[in-house]
Structure formats: C-alpha cells, structure tokens
C-alpha cells in the first residue's frame, strides 16, 4: 500500500512588530513609508493653493493663476527673491494687476518671497533655458558666461526634491560647474556683506571672484578642487 505523500508548506511570515522602534526595519517595511519632502526653505503645496485663492480675490482669472505665479517667480530671478526686492511690470493676463500687488499676498499667508520662489525654482530654470535669457543680474555676480543661468539666488531650489517638478522634467540638470559657481558667488556675497563695515578685507577675499574660482584655464578636476577650497574659505568667513 502506497504511503500518501505529505507536502510541506513554508510557514507564513510573522507580522512585523512595528511597536518596537529598536527593531531593524526591512526593505519592505521602508517601502510602506510614503514620505514627501518638506523643508521650511520651500513653500508647501497647501500654501501655494492658499496664495492662488488670494490672487483670484485680487481679480485674477482662475485659469491665469498658475501662469501668474510662474511669471512672478521668473521676475524674482531678475531682482533676487528678498523682501526688499521691487518688482516692476504687471501680470501678463491682467495689466491692471501689478506683480508687486501679487507679491504682497505672500505676507497674508506668512511666506517669504524666497520660499515662494524656491517652490517654483525648477519652473524658472526651464523658463530661462527655453527662452535662452539668463537672469538679469548674472554678470553682476561675476559668474562666467557658461554659468550665467545659475545667476539667481534661489537656484538651489532646482536641486530640491521639495520644489515643484515640471511635467516634462528639467530641460537639463544643472552642471557641477554651475552648482559650484553659484555656491562661490553666494558665499562671496555673504562674506563681503559681513566685512562691509570693515576697513580691510582678507588678502585672498580682495581678489577672489567667481571668475577666479572657476574660470582659470585648467583641467575640470582642478577647477572643482580650486572652487572647493575657495568656497570653504568663504564659508568660514561667513560663519557657515
């Protein structure tokens, strides 16, 4: 008489004990976490939605809200995103509404121009590249010509996962050279501001420009090494 075969089945995995914070999480555990990047440096989608409602109360047509925000952020790229910035011109869809009037709505919902612009930084980056028109102040920052599109103060938002992603993605990502040039210009400006009331500058700071940091003819690797050294010095001067 044949012996009936017995099949062995693998035991079902025990449910993970998620009450124990000291238990090492598995990759499957981590996949269950639906995290969205947030930072106080970037306005939130909810804040942008509230801002849109305020724009409509000013008389902006509902279908013009998003383009008005893109235009506003692009205008800030020319003058820098600060409370003291003075915006000229009107919103494209309604000549009766000035950009300055739209910008005043930031303070109603307690966000800064920089937070607003950081949210739209990737949109602005695409606008700059698509039009082939760099920020108006790029030359004043001392940026080399091949880094001119990085010449706006909320450029780092282009690299932030908390910023709004264009539907088609970036036209191109920023180059390492553009990232380094922006960083050098940023810390150079902070250092000079800190020393504005001083009678003398450190010798290396007197002669340091973004051009001297990234434009001296040399190999790409040496470019980055020189930039990193100069940027480190600037951070020390700024107390950063």
From Swiss-Prot:
Quote the Pfam families the UniProt record gives: Flexi_CP
Q: Which PROSITE patterns match?
A: POTEX_CARLAVIRUS_COAT
Q: Which domain of life is it from?
A: Viruses
Record the organism.
Answer: Narcissus mosaic virus
- Record field: compositional bias (Polar residues): 1-10
Function of the molecule: Required for genome encapsidation. Forms ribonucleoprotein complexes along with TGB1 helicase and viral RNA.
Q: Which residues does the annotated region (Disordered) include?
A: 1-27
UniProt keywords (A-Z) are: Capsid protein, Helical capsid protein, Ribonucleoprotein, Virion
**Stated family:** Belongs to the potexvirus capsid protein family.
For molecular function, the Gene Ontology terms on record are: structural molecule activity
Q: What GO cellular component entries does it have?
A: helical viral capsid; ribonucleoprotein complex
Matching InterPro entries, A to Z?
Pltvir_coat (IPR000052)
Give the chief site where it resides. Answer: virion
The protein's location, in the record's own words, is:
Virion
The protein, known as: Coat protein
